[in-house]
Amino acid sequence: MTVIPPGTDLDEFHPPQKNHQYPFAKQIDRFLNNPEKPLILALSRPDERKNILKLVEAYGESKALQQAANLLIVAGTRDDIRDLDDGPQDVLTNLLLFIDIYDLYGRVAVPKSHRASEVAEIYRLVAAGGGVFINPALTEPFGLTLLEAAASGLPVVATENGGPVDIIENCRNGVL
């Protein structure tokens, strides 16, 4: 028996091209004091299992990390947090509270929306700036975002549970 895992479209997810302009950068740069810094990207739905709050906490407690890079969290699309279901509402509310507690204004970007068609561009934008993709999920059955990020030229960081173990081992572009 052969296991064929899900893949990713390499025509859509590919490394950045030199001197390419990324329109999504405008949505990110408005949050940041120093948008030239590399980005640490987390891209997931706002779900407690995705462990985004622990990422913000770790970033908030590391002055060295804050000096080296900005944090970009792409966590779904919203108009008003109060209109979301309880789970996503709690995650996003706490995310904003953590940004306040650690005084991360100017260092963390949390755009309100993105289109599915912009995801590949977001990965390439981060890769072009020397950034990294992080999947802080407590457990990840597969981890399609890791494949997409790797195909887009990003090094990846993930927890040592589930699919990321095999993906990072095969892609040889990250750490657990």
Per-segment meaning from a language model:
Residues L138:
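Aromatic "clamp/platform" in nucleotide-sugar-dependent glycosyltransferases that forms part
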Residues P155-A158, V175:
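Short hydrophobic beta-strand element within catalytic cores of glycosyltransferases
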Residues A149:
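Donor-sugar nucleotide-binding helix/loop cap in glycosyltransferases
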Residues I28-K50, V56, L71-V74:
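Conserved donor-binding/catalytic core segment of Leloir-type glycosyltransferases
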